């Protein structure tokens, strides 16, 4: 069973590759939260996976919230792993996730990171990758995920996460500030280029966008995944002045 969260599609692509190879069921975390489905029954030979993007050098708050409520019936120390997608590095994501899992009495046997195209654009200096780098990351991700699949099939116990520089500062100091101050949807708006196509509404993984007339309106249950911004065909979705002249990215697969 593979639990996953994805906004712009990088982690969804990874989760799909793992599900096909491991023949494990996929569970989209926002759907489980919406339906309040927190209890899952495990086979004795089940592989349990968590797949998610890195948000400010840690797992997204929505993933940690789900784990707190999750109940795994029939858990007998089955092989449990995680795979995270990141634009550059993961910080102390492994520590954060292992702590959340240990509070449930679950052991994490393996963890991996996959470098994927950047999509965070809400801070100065942050933008999507240039097209050449984007294409290289997507190409390199294929053999990386193949290797991860092979390790999972062998139930290997190993952690291959690229922590990067100053991981403590990034995860323990910057991430809490991100969760406190950068999760608000209040600055989202659409320019006159909006054509009312509803793609932003349909792409929101938590159903936080409603169309009022022909314009999207954001609620307060935002994960800051930026799917709405990146999926807009008119580049009409903006976030204050922070997204001016910045690019868009949505996983092509």
What are these regions (language model features)?
Residues 249-252:
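Active-site-proximal loop/hinge segments that shape catalytic or ion-binding/gating pockets
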Residues 2, 6-33, 42-52, 56-177, ...:
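FMN-binding flavodoxin-like domain, especially the glycine-rich phosphate-binding loop
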Residues 164-196, 202:
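A mid-sequence, solvent-exposed acidic-amphipathic segment
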Residues 22-23, 184-186, 214:
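Generic structural motif recognizing short loop/turn segments at the entrances and edges of beta-strands
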Residues 189-190, 195-217, 223, 227-244:
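Iron-sulfur cluster-binding cysteine motifs and their immediate structural context
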Residues 36-38:
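Short acidic active-site motifs
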């Amino acid at each position: 069973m593979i639990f996953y969260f994805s906004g712009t599609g990088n982690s969804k692509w990874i989760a799909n590759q793992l599900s096909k190879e491991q023949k494990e069921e996929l569970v989209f975390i926002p759907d489980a939260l919406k339906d309040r489905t927190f209890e899952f029954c495990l086979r004795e030979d089940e592989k349990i996976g968590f797949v998610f993007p890195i948000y400010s050098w840690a797992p997204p708050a929505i993933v940690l919230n789900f784990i707190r409520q999750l109940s795994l019936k029939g858990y007998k120390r089955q092989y449990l792993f995680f795979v995270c997608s990141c634009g550059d590095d993961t910080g102390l994501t492994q520590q954060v996730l292992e702590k959340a899992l240990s509070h449930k009495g679950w052991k994490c046997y393996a963890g991996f990171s996959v470098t994927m195209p950047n999509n965070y654009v809400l801070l100065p200096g942050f933008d999507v990758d240039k097209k050449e780098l984007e294409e290289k990351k997507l190409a390199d991700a294929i053999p990386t995920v193949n290797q991860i699949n092979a390790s999972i099939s062998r139930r290997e116990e190993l952690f291959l996460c690229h922590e990067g520089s100053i991981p403590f500062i990034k995860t323990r100091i910057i991430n809490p500030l991100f969760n406190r101050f950068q999760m608000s949807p209040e600055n989202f708006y659409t320019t006159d280029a909006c054509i009312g196509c509803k793609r932003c509404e349909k792409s929101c993984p938590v159903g936080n966008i409603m169309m009022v007339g022909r314009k999207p309106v954001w609620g307060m249950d935002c994960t800051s995944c930026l799917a709405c911004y990146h999926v807009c065909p008119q580049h009409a979705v903006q976030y204050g002045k922070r997204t001016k002249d910045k690019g868009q990215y949505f996983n092509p697969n």
